[in-house]
Amino acid sequence: MGHQNIWYSHPRKYGKGSRSCKICGNKHGLIRKYSMNICRQCFREYAKDIGFIKYR
């Protein structure tokens, strides 16, 4: 059994490892509110298209 076979063999059904950004697939900095599941970088890029308005 090589290193690659062992490295990601554990099932990811819950926790941080199971979730990723819908747009880019990134696992860090996820915004999960309202079940968006978008990373913060993609959120800044697509916020206006989604319907969020920046007041300041």
Curated annotation (Swiss-Prot):
For this chain, one GO molecular function annotation is: zinc ion binding
Give residues annotated as binding Zn(2+): 21, 24, 39, 42
* Name of the featured protein: Small ribosomal subunit protein uS14
Which family does the entry's similarity section mention? Answer: Belongs to the universal ribosomal protein uS14 family.
Q: Which cofactors does it use? A: Zn(2+)
Pfam families recorded for this chain?
Answer: Ribosomal_S14
NCBIfam families (alphabetical)? PRK05766.1 (NF004424)
Note the InterPro entries from the entry. Ribosomal_uS14, RIbosomal_uS14_euk_arc, Ribosomal_uS14_sf
Any GO CC annotation of this UniProt entry: cytosolic small ribosomal subunit
Asked if the keyword Zinc belongs to this entry, the reply reads: yes
Name the source organism.
Griffithsia japonica
Which keywords are on file for this protein? Metal-binding, Ribonucleoprotein, Ribosomal protein, Zinc
What does the record give as the organism's lineage? Answer: Eukaryota, Rhodophyta, Florideophyceae, Rhodymeniophycidae, Ceramiales
Please indicate if the UniProt record lists Ribonucleoprotein as a keyword: yes
> What does the record note about the cofactor?
Binds 1 zinc ion per subunit.
Q: Which domain of life is it from?
A: Eukaryota
Which GO terms are recorded in the biological process aspect for this UniProt protein? cytoplasmic translation
